[in-house]
Amino acid sequence: MRNAKLYSFSLPMEAGVVLRYQRLKTRDGFLVCLEQNGKQGWGEISPLPEFSHETLEQAQDAAQSWLAAWCLGENPTDSELPSVAFGISCALAELEGTLPEEANYRAAPLCNGDPDDLILSLNEMSGEKVAKVKVGLYEAVRDGIVVNLLLEAIPDLKLRLDANRSWTPAKAEGFAKYVNPQWRDRIAFLEEPCKTPEESLAFSQATGINIAWDETVRDEGFEVKAQEGVTAIVIKPTLVGSLARCQSIVEQAHALGLEAIISSSIESSFGLTQLARVAQWLTPDSIPGLDTVDLIKQQLIRCWPDVDIPLITLEQLKTVWQQ
């Protein structure tokens, strides 16, 4: 006997979270619960505004169709909507016991504002010092100055930068001018500096700054391949698709000597704890990009360790579908 439920959630965001051109006030999504033979499996379905192609309503419709078929004893193929495919594949993996419990909670701290705050937190960090800075939100020259300041202040720091395809080649060049050439090799990678992969590759070859693919992974026809200047593949499962799809990309990246990074799409604490398990399972030697729990004012059912943020329980969620 198979049963399934779909719960909806809407969690308030901290002020100032902007995705491309939209301020995000709440993080909305669904939790899916599968039940069979006295066991349960859970997953989160939360398309990310401005980044996911599917809307919340489309995700709900697709999830309900998949769940209805599953409850009738069918084994439907993965949804074509990445957020649905990922959430349901996590629920199936929990149900079948194939998603290991061990999690990788190491995080690359995210610098959202004052670089001095990041310097303080990194000075307290033991072991490998890795941090992430979003660039492309302000002037490219300012970004270059901030990155240079961080690399100068902390000699053993490795920086991950993310530009979200924000820059023209001229702006990317303006950024690089302000980063001391002798420190550029401590930029672990810069995700998607320019609007096209071709421009990003040219930027890397001109500046010696390593790059990583993120949005490109989700382009139609994407293939993992060795390219000069590309050192990493960033995988955001909510935007990429099922666990099997993510695992395939990780294995292809590792086979070519590229680093694979499991990264957040601002999921709830519930989704983040699952991503930490996925990261430990598929990329145990890499620090995942999951330092987003404090962007949301409430945690959801499962807590991120050592975080003092109020918790929403299952009883507080609305059931939107069950069978």
UniProtKB/Swiss-Prot annotation:
Protein's UniProt keywords contain Metal-binding: yes
Cofactor(s) it depends on: a divalent metal cation
One biological process term in Gene Ontology: menaquinone biosynthetic process
EC number: 4.2.1.113
Catalysed reactions listed for this entry: (1R,6R)-6-hydroxy-2-succinyl-cyclohexa-2,4-diene-1-carboxylate = 2-succinylbenzoate + H2O
Gene3D superfamilies per record: Enolase-like C-terminal domain (3.20.20.120), Enolase-like, N-terminal domain (3.30.390.10)
Catalytic residue positions: 134 (proton donor), 236 (proton acceptor)
Pathway: Quinol/quinone metabolism; 1,4-dihydroxy-2-naphthoate biosynthesis; 1,4-dihydroxy-2-naphthoate from chorismate: step 4/7; Quinol/quinone metabolism; menaquinone biosynthesis
GO terms of molecular function: magnesium ion binding; O-succinylbenzoate synthase activity
SMART domains: MR_MLE
Keywords, sorted A to Z: Lyase, Magnesium, Menaquinone biosynthesis, Metal-binding
Binding site for Mg(2+): 162, 191, 214
InterPro entries: Enolase-like_C_sf, Enolase-like_N, Enolase_C-like, Mandelate_racemase_C, OSB_synthase_MenC1, OSBS_N
Function description: Converts 2-succinyl-6-hydroxy-2,4-cyclohexadiene-1-carboxylate (SHCHC) to 2-succinylbenzoate (OSB).
PANTHER family linked: O-SUCCINYLBENZOATE SYNTHASE (PTHR48073:SF2), O-SUCCINYLBENZOATE SYNTHASE-RELATED (PTHR48073)
NCBIfam families, sorted: menC_gam_Gplu, PRK05105.1
Protein family per UniProt: Belongs to the mandelate racemase/muconate lactonizing enzyme family. MenC type 1 subfamily.
Protein name in UniProt: o-succinylbenzoate synthase
Species for this entry: Proteus mirabilis (strain HI4320)
Gene: menC
